């Protein structure tokens, strides 16, 4: 049985959400909103708001989503650097990111770090205590990829110490995140419920993409994207897709 899927159908939605978390964290939106509602006007105006322009954004994983974030960040006047072990330097440059030779190099230069990488044995707890230690003081950290890429104990320690000034998290090691998680009680963390890719537009695009693959099979054509490559040998009788 061929299993088809819809890669890239929610890339714009996730990239926009990542950029929203970046801006929200830099502008300290959640804290300022809370203080303004309490009529603490003066305090709200001096809660560490700073500019995006001129800051260095480090993108970990410059795929479908990362390249879109790079384009958005450049429009805000950010310097964009990227690390992706699966892409050559020339391709990273073409995708709008200055290539970094290693994760450590990126961590040491970025004012803002955003993760766009799958969870694999190689990326499990990639953002651990050692990685946090390599970051610049006062960094902003954003993750809209997979929760287990981050070691939340190390992340929490960094947030409490001020090493990580602010964070925007759409994903967590365990989901739903427990209501007693300390991350939920940090003023310098914006949290959302793994919804970056869930928009009306992305759901429609996903449905249309999968339906198109099903129709190709019914027409006797090979689908464009098959999730289980072991069935490819059983699809050789199908003709290449015409559309």
Residue ranges and their predicted role:
Residues 66-67:
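N-terminal Rossmann-fold NAD(P) dinucleotide-binding loop
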Residues 170, 194, 220:
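Active-site glycine-centered loops adjacent to acidic/histidine catalytic or metal-binding residues
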Residues 9, 144-146, 177, 193-202:
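Glycine-rich phosphate/pyrophosphate-binding beta-alpha loops
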Residues 6-56, 71, 223-227:
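Phosphate-binding beta-alpha-beta segment of Rossmann-like dinucleotide-binding domains, i.e.
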Residues 78-79:
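Residues at the starts of beta-strands that form the adenosine-phosphate
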Residues 202-243:
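NAD(P)-dependent dehydrogenase/reductase Rossmann-like domain
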Residues 85-182:
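Rossmann-like adenosine-cofactor binding region
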Residues 62-63:
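Glycine-rich Rossmann-fold phosphate-binding loop(s) that bind the pyrophosphate
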């Amino acid at each position: 049985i061929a299993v088809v899927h819809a890669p890239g159908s929610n890339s714009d939605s996730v990239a926009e959400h990542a950029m929203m978390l970046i801006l929200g964290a830099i502008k300290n939106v959640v804290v300022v909103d809370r203080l303004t509602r309490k009529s603490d006007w003066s305090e709200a105006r001096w809660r560490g708001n700073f500019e995006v322009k001129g800051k260095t954004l480090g993108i970990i994983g410059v795929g479908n989503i990362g390249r879109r974030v790079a384009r958005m960040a450049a429009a805000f006047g950010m310097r964009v650097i990227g690390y992706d072990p699966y892409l050559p330097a020339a391709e990273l440059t073409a995708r709008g990111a200055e290539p970094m030779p290693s994760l450590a190099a990126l961590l040491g230069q970025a004012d803002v770090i955003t993760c766009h990488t799958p969870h694999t044995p190689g990326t499990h707890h990639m953002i651990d205590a050692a990685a946090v230690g390599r970051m610049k003081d006062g960094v902003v950290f954003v993750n809209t990829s997979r929760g287990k890429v981050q070691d939340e104990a190390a992340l929490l320690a960094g947030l409490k110490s001020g090493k990580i000034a602010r964070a925007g998290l759409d994903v967590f090691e365990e989901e739903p995140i427990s209501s007693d998680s300390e991350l939920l009680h940090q003023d310098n963390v914006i949290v959302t419920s793994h919804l970056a890719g869930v928009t009306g537009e992305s759901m429609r695009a996903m449905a249309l993409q999968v339906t198109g693959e099903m129709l190709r099979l019914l027409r006797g054509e090979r689908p464009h994207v098959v999730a289980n490559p072991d069935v490819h040998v059983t699809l050789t009788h199908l003709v290449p897709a015409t559309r």
